[in-house]
């Protein structure tokens, strides 16, 4: 909040795994948006489940204008036994129309 109020940031990179998930990420975005600071969603080494959450947040929030959500692509098996959630074609993510994050998890 302080970085926004003192005009110290042009954009804020929200990382779901560092901030604690979707709810804290939404709070960060709301503070940034109230102070006219754009956001992006970034990732570290998240699985496809976490990336699906991040991409869903990007799609839902007008103030989030950028995304770096490609960590799952570097896995030996990018699907990680969890098909669905989204498709990527030419860097464009298309979300599933299934409920929730749209991922099929079969343990």
Where are these predicted regions, by residue range?
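Catalytic core of soluble alpha/beta enzymes
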Residues: 1-50, 79, 88
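Flexible C-terminal active-site loop/helix
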Residues: 6, 44-107
């Amino acid at each position: 909040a302080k970085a926004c109020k003192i005009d110290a940031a042009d954009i804020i990179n929200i990382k779901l795994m560092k901030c604690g998930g979707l709810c804290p990420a939404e709070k960060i975005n709301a503070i940034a948006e109230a102070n006219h600071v754009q956001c992006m969603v970034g990732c570290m080494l998240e699985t496809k489940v976490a990336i699906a959450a991040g991409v869903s947040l990007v799609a839902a929030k007008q103030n989030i204008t950028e995304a770096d959500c490609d960590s799952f692509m570097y896995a030996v098996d990018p699907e990680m036994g969890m098909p669905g959630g989204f498709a990527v074609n030419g860097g464009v993510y298309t979300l599933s129309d299934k409920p929730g994050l749209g991922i099929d998890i079969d343990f």
